[in-house]
Amino acid sequence: MESQAKVKISDKAEGIIERDVQNAVIGRREILLKVYHMGSGTPSRKDIIKAISQAFASQENLVVVRKISTSYGAGISNVKLHIYKSREILEKIEPKYLLDRDAGTKQKKGGSKGGQGAKG
């Protein structure tokens, strides 16, 4: 895809691809996306993954949202994401917590060892 291409994220959000780099050594595309969502919240990772996978004709499980940064009150977010050629490469390179985030599963935090009966 050429740079400055538009991607519809949702009814209230639209993105513009600012940079699209093919990293042949690793086997992935590295994309910087600027998302405009005036008057609404930051789009979810699932919405972004769905829109990008449709725009680039790739499977949703091969798209990883690395970072979403939004300035307070601006209605504009910068999104860094990667599209991999295979799931094996993705799992070797990307951290597990990011894959869990994109899948919508929550990791369980350490917490106390005492459990529910810790207070006496």
UniProtKB/Swiss-Prot annotation:
It comes from the Archaea. One of its GO terms (molecular function) is structural constituent of ribosome. Keywords: Ribonucleoprotein, Ribosomal protein. Residues 101-120 are annotated as: Disordered. The keyword Flavoprotein does not apply. InterPro entries: eRP_eS24_sf (IPR053709), Ribosomal_eS24 (IPR001976), Ribosomal_eS24_CS (IPR018098), Ribosomal_uL23/eL15/eS24_sf (IPR012678). It holds the Pfam family Ribosomal_S24e. Gene3D superfamilies: 3.30.70.3370. GO terms for biological process: translation. Belongs to the eukaryotic ribosomal protein eS24 family. This is Small ribosomal subunit protein eS24.
